[in-house]
């Protein structure tokens, strides 16, 4: 499968205009059967890489997913990471913060769940909510006990971007590789998926009035995402704006990016020392008796 993932990568310092980024590209598969074959190959590839990551125990991988409602975050996570050993991969979904979490800084609740070395951590939404939904609805800040006198203008958001960049630089320096995915869905495709959630009884549970309410702020969200991607994509911790109107295509792109990221790490299985090899041979002889 040849996917040039660089075309979806946001360059460090690049000013993002999402209107110029595609929400759909030509499919990388020829049929549904071909898609399943490609994805199965990718899942097996990721499973092998995760095993090597765990055995080498030098790096951790953090995958962050952000998107508008109905963009397919859950589906991407489920399909792409389905073949990975559950002991080596943890998924965390961050929704409304608890009362305890609100008493801490905005990065606290997510940093508690960062992956340790040898593991893959997946954040379904993340600390980026604090510069996305909170920027669209700044009244949320009133519940965050932000210090009195703080002005919620441009400088406030730039401080948050800087805090995020500093955190990610620190994590990278200590062995965690971070890859961030924005599933770029068109407004029209979201409408179609919302209608499907209403029209198909088995999908009714996925839809709420809040989803429709947030859709009214579409332009505000796009503006917040543009600023976020522009300010926080870096060479070490890049954002990928993944076209998400085609769910199958999005899954293939994400799987390819993850595989390329993991293959770029200097990983190897631990070498067996002569003493250990001698010990293993002795145990083998005992088993053969």
Swiss-Prot record:
A Pfam family cross-referenced in the UniProt record is: PPK2
This entry's Enzyme Commission designation comes to 2.7.4.-
Q: Name one GO biological process term.
A: polyphosphate metabolic process
Source superkingdom: Bacteria
The name this protein carries in UniProt is ADP-polyphosphate phosphotransferase
The UniProt function text for this chain reads: Uses inorganic polyphosphate (polyP) as a donor to convert ADP to ATP.
Q: Which family does it belong to?
A: Belongs to the polyphosphate kinase 2 (PPK2) family. Class I subfamily.
Could you cite one Gene Ontology molecular function of this protein? polyphosphate kinase activity
Tell me yes or no: is Metal-binding among this UniProt entry's keywords.
no
Disulfide bonds, paired cysteine numbers: none
């Amino acid at each position: 499968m040849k996917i040039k993932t660089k075309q979806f990568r946001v360059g460090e310092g690049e000013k993002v205009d999402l209107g110029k980024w595609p929400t759909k590209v030509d499919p990388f598969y020829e049929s549904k059967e071909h898609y399943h074959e490609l994805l199965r190959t990718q899942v097996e590839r990721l499973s092998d890489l995760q095993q090597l990551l765990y055995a080498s125990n030098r790096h951790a991988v953090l995958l962050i997913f952000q998107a508008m409602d109905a963009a397919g975050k859950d589906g991407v996570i489920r399909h792409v990471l389905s073949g990975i050993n559950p002991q080596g991969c943890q998924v965390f979904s961050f929704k409304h913060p608890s009362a305890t979490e609100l008493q801490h800084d905005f990065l606290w609740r997510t940093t508690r769940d960062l992956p340790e070395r040898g593991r893959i951590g997946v954040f379904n939404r993340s600390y980026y909510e604090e510069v996305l939904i909170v920027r669209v609805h700044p009244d949320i800040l009133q519940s965050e006990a932000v210090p009195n006198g703080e002005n919620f203008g441009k400088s406030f958001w730039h401080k948050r971007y800087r805090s995020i960049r500093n955190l990610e630089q620190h994590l990278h320096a200590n062995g965690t590789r971070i890859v961030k995915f924005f599933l770029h869905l068109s407004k029209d495709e979201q409408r179609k998926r919302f209608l499907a959630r209403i029209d198909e009884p088995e999908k009714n549970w996925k839809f709420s009035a809040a989803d429709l309410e947030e859709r009214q702020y579409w332009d505000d969200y796009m503006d917040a995402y543009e600023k976020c991607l522009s300010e926080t994509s870096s060479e070490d911790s890049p954002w990928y704006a993944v076209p998400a109107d085609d769910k199958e295509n999005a899954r293939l792109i994400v799987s390819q990016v993850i595989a390329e990221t993991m293959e770029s790490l200097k990983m190897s299985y631990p070498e067996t020392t002569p003493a250990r090899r001698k010990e293993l041979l002795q145990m083998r002889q005992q088993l053969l008796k």
